[in-house]
């Protein structure tokens, strides 16, 4: 059968537009015997952008050599070199008749892919666990924020309670001081009344003795006057005076004059004693008033110093509270910054992991497709080699018949030679395609190795993030411990102040209880004073003088009270200034709390960014769908090429034996 009877020239599959890769070929004549060698430059345009790896593989294929008639140079042992700058494919047919392929199935093994998939699964599990841990940490941070807010509210309530307790303590202290002053005044008055009573008793005894003497002198003078009257009356009735009568009269006159002189002396001494008593009482009262005023001034100074110390203590407490508030603000700022950095790192890692997962899945699909196409090409090459063996055997069987009819079959031999050359060229194209597939496979393997290396880098980043998360957890625990210690200290201070308040209350009640018998004693003293006043009505002039002095001392006491009121006003002004400073600190704290309340808006912004990342992920998934469509198109083209190869095999089978 001739080549024309077999349905014309056989169809060869093109490796250009319909193939997987586009090839630009340059043919250069470089052979040891002057035969042309083919130089092919390959540009891989399909697939992902990656690093190209130079691959040099030598595939030795036993091709069928066409029969040459005598007189022509034999084409045996002619080497065909495929040369390319990035990777060179050399095809040198050996002298042996058996076809030996250097390409093995181990080159296309999937063990590396399985190990890579296992590693990817492990990485995915680790990433999921890390994501869960980050979610747990986020929930813990939210819980801690809630606890901090509750603690802040608790602290504010405790501060209000402390302020109320401080006000009550100030009031009770004021009441206690007033009660103490009253009790001390009552004690002083009681002591003064007792001393005055003793002194008055002594003076009373002295005056009573002097009065008794004066009364006795007056009674004696009165008796003498009565006797003188009697004698004068007798003399008037008798109207005659004897010498004895004159002597008695003179004697009575002398006695009367003596009695009057003694009475005047006793009266003078009594007046002197009364004058001295008045002067002594005036000086003593002035000294006592001076002492009481000095005591009151000293008490006012001590009270002022105590109030200044209390104000300094309150200022120190306010400064400590402000420092604690600033520390809490700094801690809240650091916690918010750490949470923000964690969220940003989490989003960045999620985006990177998604991109790497998509790229890995895409690379795995492409590697699988390339392995399938390589296996198919290998099967096709083996089929073509078997066809060539069959053709060689047929040529050897027909050799004897061709020798007999060499002249008649010369044209047919030339046609078969041309057809063999075409098959040789087609086989070279197939080998070139296989080499391209192997190079792409190697490039994908290198890219897969790069992806594995990136996975390792990501693992290191994950370990660093785990360390950072543990550091953050430790910092959070330290912050919680500090908050607990501050809370415990505040509770202890509150308990101490409540204990002091209860002690002040007990002392106040005790003072009130001791105040009742003191009032009774005071009433008794007033009764005794009234009795003494009733017995000393003769000394009203002295009392008027004393009243004028008492008015003076009252005026001085009013001046001291005015000074005390001024001190109280100054204390109130200082307290108002402290309250204003505390309110300013509160306002500042509330403004900083308002700044902290802006954290949910920032979280919303980050959630919006996450939504944008999810939209980008959906776009990448759409691109993946488009790429799968392209891969299906390529598969359909490969099937068409397989159909063409089957038709080529059929055409080879129809060749004349």
Swiss-Prot record:
What is the name attached to this protein's record?
Answer: Outer dense fiber protein 2
Position of the Glycyl lysine isopeptide (Lys-Gly) (interchain with G-Cter in SUMO2) cross-link: 138
PTM comment text: Tyrosine phosphorylated. Phosphorylated on Ser-95 by TSSK4.
Could you list this entry's UniProt keywords, alphabetically sorted.
Cell projection, Cilium, Coiled coil, Cytoplasm, Cytoskeleton, Developmental protein, Differentiation, Flagellum, Isopeptide bond, Microtubule, Phosphoprotein, Spermatogenesis, Ubl conjugation
The entry's localization annotation reads: Cytoplasm, Cytoskeleton, Microtubule organizing center, Centrosome; Cell projection, Cilium; Cytoplasm, Cytoskeleton, Microtubule organizing center, Centrosome, Centriole; Cytoplasm, Cytoskeleton, Spindle pole
User: InterPro entries recorded for this chain?
Assistant: Odf2-rel
Q: Which family does it belong to?
A: Belongs to the ODF2 family.
Species of provenance: Bos taurus (Bovine)
Q: What PANTHER family does the record tag this protein with? A: OUTER DENSE FIBER OF SPERM TAILS 2, OUTER DENSE FIBER PROTEIN 2
Its principal location? cytoplasm
Q: Name the lineage.
A: Eukaryota, Metazoa, Chordata, Craniata, Vertebrata
Question: Cellular component terms, GO, for this chain's entry?
Answer: centriole; centrosome; cytoplasm; microtubule; sperm flagellum; sperm midpiece; sperm principal piece; spindle pole
Gene Ontology process terms (BP): cell differentiation; regulation of cilium assembly; spermatogenesis
Question: What role does it play?
Answer: Seems to be a major component of sperm tail outer dense fibers (ODF). ODFs are filamentous structures located on the outside of the axoneme in the midpiece and principal piece of the mammalian sperm tail and may help to maintain the passive elastic structures and elastic recoil of the sperm tail. May have a modulating influence on sperm motility. Functions as a general scaffold protein that is specifically localized at the distal/subdistal appendages of mother centrioles. Component of the centrosome matrix required for the localization of PLK1 and NIN to the centrosomes.
Is Cytoplasm there in the keyword field? yes
Residue stretches in coiled coil: 144-423, 461-635
Q: Which residues carry this modification: Phosphoserine?
A: 73-74, 95, 106, 109, 115, 129, 139, 261, 632
Tell me where the signal peptide lies.
Answer: none
Q: At which residues is Phosphothreonine found?
A: 92, 110, 231
Q: State the oligomer form and interacting partners.
A: Self-associates. Associates with microtubules and forms a fibrillar structure partially linked to the microtubule network. Interacts via its C-terminus with PLK1. Interacts with ODF1. Interacts with MARK4; the interaction is required for localization of ODF2 to centrioles. Interacts with TSSK4. Interacts with AKNA. Interacts with CFAP58. Interacts with BBOF1. Interacts with CCDC38. Interacts with CCDC42.
């Amino acid at each position: 059968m001739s080549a024309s009877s077999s349905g014309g020239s056989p169809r060869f599959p093109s490796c250009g537009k319909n193939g997987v890769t586009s090839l630009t070929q340059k043919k250069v004549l470089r052979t040891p015997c002057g035969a042309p060698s083919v130089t092919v430059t390959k540009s891989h345009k399909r697939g992902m952008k990656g690093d190209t790896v130079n691959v040099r593989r030598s595939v030795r294929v036993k091709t069928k050599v066409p029969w040459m008639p005598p007189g022509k140079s034999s084409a045996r042992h002619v080497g065909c070199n495929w040369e390319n700058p990035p990777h060179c494919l050399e095809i040198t047919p050996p002298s042996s008749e058996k076809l030996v392929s250097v390409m093995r199935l181990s080159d296309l093994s999937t063990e590396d892919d399985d190990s890579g998939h296992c590693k990817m699964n492990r990485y995915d599990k680790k990433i999921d666990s890390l994501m869960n841990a980050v979610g747990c940490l986020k929930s813990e941070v939210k819980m801690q924020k809630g606890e901090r807010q509750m603690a802040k509210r608790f602290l504010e309530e405790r501060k209000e309670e402390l302020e109320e307790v401080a006000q009550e303590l100030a009031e009770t202290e004021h009441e206690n001081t007033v009660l103490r002053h009253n009790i001390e005044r009552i004690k002083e008055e009681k002591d003064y009344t007792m001393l005055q009573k003793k002194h008055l008793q002594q003076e009373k005894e002295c005056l009573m003795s002097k009065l008794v003497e004066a009364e006795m002198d007056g009674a004696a003078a009165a008796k003498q006057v009565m006797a003188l009257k009697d004698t004068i009356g007798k003399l008037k009735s008798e109207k005659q005076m004897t010498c004895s009568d004159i002597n008695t009269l003179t004697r009575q006159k002398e006695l009367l004059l003596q009695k009057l002189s003694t009475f005047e002396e006793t009266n003078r001494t009594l007046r002197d004693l009364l004058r001295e008593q008045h002067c002594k009482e005036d000086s003593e009262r002035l000294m006592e008033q001076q002492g009481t005023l000095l005591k009151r001034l000293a008490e006012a100074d001590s009270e002022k110093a105590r109030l200044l110390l209390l104000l300094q203590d309150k200022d120190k407490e306010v400064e400590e509270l402000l420092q604690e508030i600033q520390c809490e603000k700094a801690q809240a700022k650091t916690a918010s910054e750490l949470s923000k950095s964690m969220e940003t790192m989490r989003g960045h890692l999620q985006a990177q992991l998604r991109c790497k997962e998509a790229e890995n899945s895409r690379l795995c699909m492409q590697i699988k497709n390339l392995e399938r196409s390589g296996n198919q090409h290998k099967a096709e090459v083996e089929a073509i080699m078997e066809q060539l063996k069959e053709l060689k055997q047929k040529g050897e069987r027909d050799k004897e018949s061709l020798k007999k009819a060499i002249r008649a079959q010369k044209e047919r031999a030339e046609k078969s030679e041309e057809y063999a050359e075409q098959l040789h060229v087609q086989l070279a194209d197939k080998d070139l395609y296989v080499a391209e597939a192997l190079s792409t496979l190697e490039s994908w393997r290198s890219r897969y190795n790069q992806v594995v290396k990136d996975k390792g880098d990501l693992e290191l980043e994950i370990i660093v993030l785990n360390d950072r998360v543990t550091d953050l957890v430790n910092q959070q625990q330290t912050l919680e411990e500090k908050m607990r210690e501050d809370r415990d200290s505040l509770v202890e201070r509150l308990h101490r102040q409540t204990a002091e308040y209860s002690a002040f209350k007990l002392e106040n009640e005790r003072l009130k209880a001791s105040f009742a018998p003191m009032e009774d004693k005071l009433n008794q003293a007033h009764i005794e004073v009234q009795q003494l006043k009733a017995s000393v009505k003769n000394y009203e002039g002295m009392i008027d003088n004393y009243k004028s002095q008492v008015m003076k001392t009252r005026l001085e006491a009013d001046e001291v009270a005015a000074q005390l009121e001024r001190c109280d006003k100054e204390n109130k002004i200082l307290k108002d200034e402290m309250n204003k400073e505390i309110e300013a600190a509160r306002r500042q704290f509330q403004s900083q709390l308002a700044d902290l309340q802006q954290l949910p808006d920032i979280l919303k912004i980050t959630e919006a960014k996450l939504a944008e990342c999810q939209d980008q992920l959906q776009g990448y998934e759409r691109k993946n769908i488009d790429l799968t469509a392209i891969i299906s198109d390529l598969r359909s083209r490969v099937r068409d090429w397989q159909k063409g190869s089957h038709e080529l095999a059929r055409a080879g089978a129809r060749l004349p034996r």
